Regions:
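Cysteine-centered motifs
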Residues: 44, 51, 56-59
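N-terminal helix-turn-helix DNA-binding module of bacterial transcription factors
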Residues: 71-144
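Hinge/cleft segment of the Venus flytrap/periplasmic-binding protein
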Residues: 131, 287-288, 304, 393-439
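Amphipathic helical "hinge" segments at domain boundaries
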Residues: 136-196
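Hinge/beta->alpha junction and helix N-cap segments in small-molecule ligand-binding domains
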Residues: 155-164, 185-196, 253-259, 281-299, ...
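Hydrophobic alpha-helical segments within soluble ligand-binding/sensing domains
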Residues: 251-277, 327, 393-410
């Protein structure tokens, strides 16, 4: 019989509880400075002072503990003989003996290999059910000694951006599972050049990945790629935007519609008396650059229509790929033409563009609601130009997406198909308590 520490922990715990429940309790006596301690020349084995072994309360308690410990082997033997859950290791040869088949037959059944007769398979499966056999997925994966390649297809981005947080989380997940021979490949496409998306996807397939983390673009382009992934039986996880019709293994991200709805509600707590507010969008050729931003805007406008239909929403598009001077010129023109605007909602992680402009032009009467705890946004929040940020836990998304591929492909486990990130509101007062590594 093989004994584990986990087997005797409950017994030791029970014995210790009984000891400390005694009267007087040992813990209480240790805290008391004054207690009856007759000294007749015998050194106490517990307190290192002179005592009478027969009357010393410390020695009496230690004798009880020693007696309880001496009972542990007897209790273990009793539990083992009565089949009370001792964690004996079940070997393949034990299963084969119980089923009356060969070890090779059991191995083929466990690993779902062919060349096993129906009767032999039924015998083995019956024994597996009886003993509640559960294979050690981690041990099997380690023994397999196979190299796995996971590809992440993400938009190109500047340093300290939302997507960099996702990359850091993904790389951390691989680092923590390096014993399983995981490898990650980061591949990027340009949102300024949509044709690079399918080209990046094609190059990714040439690497023969075992799994893919994917940020969708248009439905048509994304579906063309995911259809090929299904044909090649390559699992994929979606980030940023959920497209259930594509049948991904899993999705990680916020409910964009609810996020926009929530943002409008929070903003109007401080802007309920305003006649108009500003909505800032990041666009390319006049269109928003992601379905996520599009859904946020839909949710935002839905709340405003339902609760503040009289408030005018003015829209300002900031084209992608422009420099700081170009953005500041657009913002200066807007605020010069609309001096009554005091509240702004940005649909992406670049709230710092507007926030930085407000700081440089000393406009202290405009409050911004934006997205993502990237460093530039956090700095604007600390300096007062951004009032609120909605955190998306980008680092956690990157980590969890790789973890989902690992659990499904390597450990052969089921994963949850939809995983919404919390909609967490940050302000100047709690921004320093936000931790990206909360996993």
């Amino acid at each position: 019989m093989i004994l584990y520490i986990s087997d005797i922990q409950p017994i030791i715990l029970f014995s210790t509880i009984q000891l400390f429940r005694s009267d007087p309790p040992l813990g209480k006596m240790a805290a008391d400075k004054e207690f009856p301690m007759p000294a007749d020349g015998i050194r106490c084995g517990f307190t290192a002072v002179f005592c009478n072994k027969r009357t010393c309360p410390y020695c009496r308690q230690m004798k009880k503990l020693a007696k309880a410990i001496r009972l542990i082997p007897t209790l273990l033997l009793f539990l083992h003989k009565n089949g009370m859950g001792m964690n004996d290791r079940i070997r393949i040869k034990d299963i084969a003996a119980k089923a009356g088949v060969s070890v090779g037959t059991v191995d083929r059944v466990l690993h779902k290999r062919p060349n096993v007769s129906k009767s032999a398979r039924e015998k083995v499966e019956r024994i597996l059910r009886e003993i509640d056999y559960r294979p050690n997925a981690y041990a099997s994966a380690l023994a397999c000694n196979k190299d796995y390649v996971f590809c992440c297809i993400l938009p190109e981005h500047a340093s300290e951006a939302y997507w960099e947080e996702i990359e850091l989380g993904a790389m951390k997940a691989v680092e923590l599972r390096r014993d399983f021979h995981l490898n990650i490949r980061l591949r990027h496409f340009s949102r300024l050049h949509p044709e690079t998306y399918l080209e990046t996807c094609r190059r990714c397939l040439e690497e023969k990945p075992d799994g893919i983390v994917l940020v969708p673009t248009t439905v048509e382009e994304t579906k063309a790629f995911t259809d090929e992934l299904h044909r090649q039986d390559i699992p994929f996880v979606l980030l940023d935007s959920n497209m259930p019709d594509l049948e991904p293994l899993s999705f990680y991200g916020q409910d964009s519609f609810q996020s926009g709805y929530f943002a409008a509600r929070m903003l109007m707590l401080i802007a309920r008396k305003e006649e108009s507010i500003l909505l800032v969008r990041q666009t390319f050729e006049g269109k928003v650059t992601s379905r996520q931003q599009e859904n946020r805007e839909v949710g935002f406008r839905r709340y405003m229509e339902e609760h503040y239909p009289e408030v005018e929403i003015k829209t300002l598009n900031l084209p992608m790929g422009k420099d700081k001077a170009a953005y500041h010129e657009l913002l200066e023109d807007f605020f010069h033409a609309n001096p009554g605007i005091h509240h702004c909602f940005t649909t992406n992680s670049r709230a710092y563009i507007t926030g930085g402009f407000l700081l440089e032009t000393n406009r202290r009467n405009v409050q911004i609601m934006g997205y993502d705890m990237v460093p530039k946004n956090a700095e604007c929040m600390r300096r007062g130009s951004i009032s609120f940020l909605i955190a998306q836990h980008a680092y956690q998304q990157g980590f969890s997406s790789i973890d989902a591929l690992f659990r499904n492909i390597v450990l052969k486990k089921e994963v949850r198909p939809i995983n919404y990130m919390p909609i967490e509101l940050l302000s100047k007062e709690n921004v320093d308590f936000y931790h990206r590594t909360r996993i």
